[in-house]
Structures are given as C-alpha cells and as structure tokens.
C-alpha cells in the first residue's frame, strides 16, 4: 500500500535523523503499529535491528505482534492471507505463546474451505492439549470428519471425550 510506504519512509527519516530523541522513540512506536496493521512484522524486526539508538524488539514481542497481525487479517474476513500468516507464525514460533490460537484459526479456516486434512491436522494439534479453550470445538470438528469418513470407532472416541467435557 502506497500510504503505508510513504508513512514508513517519513518515520524512518525521523528515526535516522534524530536517534535517541523522543521523536525517534515515538516514530518507532508508530512504525511498529503501521507494520502490524500491514501484517509485515518481520520487516519491522529487521528495521528495528538496523536502526541507530537504543531500539530493542524482543523476540516475545515479535511473537505476539506476528500473531496479532495474522489475527487482524482473519478478523477482516481475508481467509487466504490469514491462513498464510498463521502458518508462517507457526513456522516461526512452533511453541509460541499463541500457537494454540493459530492452530484453532487454521482449523476453522480449514473447515470453511472444506479442507478436511487441515482440520484434522490442526484439531489434532489442539487435542494434544486436552484442557485448552478450543478442545470441545476441536473434538467436534475432528469427530465430524472421522464420522463422514466412516471411521466410526475413532469418531465415537472423540464424541465420548466431548460428552465427558460437556458434562463437567
């Protein structure tokens, strides 16, 4: 987007011309927001690493912002880029703070796109942690696909786990 790129260049100019100043600090804060909104957190990390002054971009913050950027794309209803962003998040942060959330969204996107393999993969990842907030929904989606594939014993096992969760 042209507007983003122009704003980025203007803020970069402030940071490089006035390193260490309050203006540079505010410019970096605004740059971070722009890059998150544009789903380009990796570019911000690279930029922060090369900028002069006391600029730090911690890995935990990069983890969080990468996830937040992907979630924003999903919330806009853009399933394909969201799928790509969540997949990239999981590749970069396989045990990241938001990995369960990312697997959940990929599971939902898979269901929306009728991609049974994606649903099974990501629901399976969610079910590795049976007490997570998404486990009931994951059991339901997982069991439904197994049932439709006539894998009744496996589907029944999922439904029994779901029943046990729903009654507790």
Spans of features found by a protein language model:
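Acidic, polar-rich low-complexity tracts and alpha-helical solenoid repeat scaffolds
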Residues: 1-168
